[in-house]
Amino acid sequence: MASRNATGGYDPSGIDLDEWEILESQLEESIPNYDRVNRLMTFGQDKVWRKNVREHAEPGMKVLEVGCGPGSFAEDITGVDLTCLDPSPEMLKVAKRRVDSARNSRGESPADYVQAIAEAIPLPDNTYDRVFCLFSFRDFQDKEKGLEEILRVLKPGGQLVICDAGKANWFHGLGGRIWMA
């Protein structure tokens, strides 16, 4: 696997385990500022992008969010049977509190929460109408395996929507290094 330094911070295949452990620790440390940093890194477009992704869900659908983080997207999606998946127990703890509070205020049932990586989703085949992956695909350990798992849990005719700012240039690479410092 090419190193992130050799590709300007971008690795199309994923990240290795050592890099992942460092990233997970940094992400957990960023929880108090996660939304603010995401807004800055996307020049304020993150809310618009999340809204556009939400429009792909229809009432009554079974929806899985892979890499839910602290629940920034999941708290605003309504009328669906929602499952939030993230490898970080700390992110899931924050997401559960945040998302279930929002769902409760709308009279909706709590979401389900699963601690797992995208490359090993412990959910049944052909379960979800939509799978959303916002701002986390770039951090998959193995993108190909993650996509295989997502496609496995999607129902036939279901849709995967990925929304990610990426790290494909020096600016995003620099921004990511500043954020994670």
Enumerate the language-model features and the residues they cover.
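N-terminal, positively charged/glycine-rich alpha-helical extensions of SAM-dependent methyltransferases
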Residues: 1-32
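Conserved alpha-helix/loop element of class I SAM-dependent methyltransferases that forms part
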Residues: 42-60
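Short glycine-centered segments of the SAM/dcSAM-binding site in methyltransferase folds
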Residues: 62, 158-159
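Class I SAM-dependent methyltransferase SAM/SAH-binding core
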Residues: 64-120
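A short SAM/SAH-binding and catalytic strip from SAM-dependent methyltransferases
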Residues: 130-142
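A short glycine-rich, Lys/Arg-flanked "PGG" loop and its adjoining helix->strand segment in the class I
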Residues: 144-156
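Conserved class I S-adenosyl-L-methionine
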Residues: 161-181
